[in-house]
Amino acid sequence: MTGRRREIRYLMPMLPLVHHPDYDARTVPDDHRFPMRKYALVADMLRAAGYEFFEPLLAPEAWLHLAHDPAYVGAILGQTLDAKAARKIGFEITPAIARRSRAAVGGTCLAARLALEHGAAVNLAGGSHHAGPDGGAGFCVFNDVAVGALLLLQEGAVRRVAVVDCDVHHGDGTALILGAEPRAFTASLHCEQNWPREKPPSDLDIGLPKGTGDAAYLAALETLVAEALASQPDLVFYNAGVDPHADDRLGLLSLSDAGLAARDRYVAEACASQAVPLCAVLGGGYSSDASAVARRHCGLVASIDAIGMSAE
């Protein structure tokens, strides 16, 4: 990145982080394909590093209705979703999953508000980009980023938003929900051969071939971020999924630890250079070793916080 960087000036000692104890839905077993324990582990690691957290409220139904069909929302909250729809999501819809899903949406909405106030913030969950208008998929129940974007637009807190989605999977649900919203720019950088098979168009899609490594990935990222910022957003939502990592079992790309750190740092620097607030969410990350995934997620916080500490 070229040019003088602007410092992210927090109105508090550290980068604002949002966490809710119900992010870890304990009804999901440890051997499930989705490493639910990572959320508690991320919080433990960051707490040990001296961070404190903002705790969000559970998103009210009215917020969820901004992005999702009320009948679908009611089926989740009432645990009446049919078995086929639940299988598409990948979870049994228990009270804990319903509560977790509302907490994650509330967390992204709170992180977005904190980002507008302080320059940047991170929700230590979120990034449920496969949830579409009338149903969930791929471990995603409610689309927290879409809800957050539409809520802030409705309230007039922002005039335009951009979504920079760097999870390894295409942001299909976000594209469907925000596709008709002219004030939202959606951009997805993903593995083209990966799930989902059908990829409804975002405003900008960059699909990378299997095995793409750091150099080619970061070159594509520059294009993605430049186009997103050219849309002149008042806020960027950044899905910082760590599933492009070479060791991720669902990823198919080959980023290193250094590559992920460079990605996160580049996004933060680009937003800071144009004084655009950044709301980051964790997104995906899949491994039988939940601690390894949690450590990768913690790298997001370190990368964003380092911009504020070291910027000229």
Briefly describe each language-model feature range.
Residues M1-E7:
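Polybasic, low-complexity intrinsically disordered segments
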Residues E7-E312:
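HDAC/HDAC-like amidohydrolase catalytic core signature
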